[in-house]
């Protein structure tokens, strides 16, 4: 059955439909060796569709994983500097999956991985405001910092969406945010004079890390997948 190229590229897990439109307009997509244009359709059972010369096949069976990422691993599939990657930790799943969003090199905890391009786009797009929770071990004056962390803040001159920050212990904070700016929590803490000693993501949406051991992964349950798709 013929389908629009942007739908085929997204279903193959290569990009979102919006990104696929940009790739088509840039001349990076071909059908049977001919440069495609917006509005073109193809049938993968008979047509050869390629992005940047790499041919795509029929959509793979969707796979959804949860990894408890250790510190020291980059949230990429490969690294030019030769650092350990999260892809190495889930290689035994037997399917090519990619991270949903990112988790800093020095951070640990819940990281979702999938080959579902549509769900990836939904979870990382700011308009969906998916809440994430982090446990953060800090040093510094927490009493003075808490009101500021819960109030209006900026990074690089841009206002942040409100965060919910609660004190759980003498040096332990819970951050609930639905943005994912680069090193956001560490930079927020730095602004209020706190030093981050450890940072762990424990929840994304309603999916929780639970007791999964550090460096291990598991498949999401059907219920967890449904919760993510409902966001």
Label every PLM stretch briefly.
Residues 1-231:
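Basic, flexible Lys/Arg- and Gly-enriched helix-loop patches that mediate nucleic-acid binding at interfaces
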């Amino acid at each position: 059955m013929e389908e629009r190229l942007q739908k085929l590229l997204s279903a193959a897990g290569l990009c979102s439909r919006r990104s696929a439109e940009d790739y088509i307009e840039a001349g990076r997509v071909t059908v049977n060796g001919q440069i495609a244009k917006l509005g073109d359709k193809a049938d993968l059972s008979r047509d050869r569709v390629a992005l940047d010369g790499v041919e795509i096949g029929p959509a793979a069976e969707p796979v959804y994983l949860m990894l408890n990422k250790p510190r020291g691993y980059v949230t990429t599939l490969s690294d030019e500097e030769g650092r350990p990657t999260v892809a190495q930790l889930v290689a035994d799943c037997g399917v090519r999956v990619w991270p949903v969003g990112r988790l800093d090199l020095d951070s640990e905890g819940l990281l979702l991985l999938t080959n579902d391009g549509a769900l990836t786009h939904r979870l990382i797009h700011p308009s969906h405001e998916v809440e994430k929770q982090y446990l953060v071990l800090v040093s510094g004056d927490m009493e003075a910092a808490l009101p500021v962390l819960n109030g209006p803040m900026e990074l690089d001159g841009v206002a942040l969406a409100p965060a919910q920050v609660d004190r759980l212990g003498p040096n332990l904070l819970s951050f609930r945010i639905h943005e994912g700016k680069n090193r956001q929590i560490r930079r927020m803490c730095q602004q209020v004079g706190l030093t981050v000693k450890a940072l762990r993501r424990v929840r994304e949406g309603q999916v929780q890390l639970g007791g999964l051991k550090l460096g291990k992964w598991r498949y999401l349950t059907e219920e967890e997948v449904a919760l993510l798709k409902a966001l």
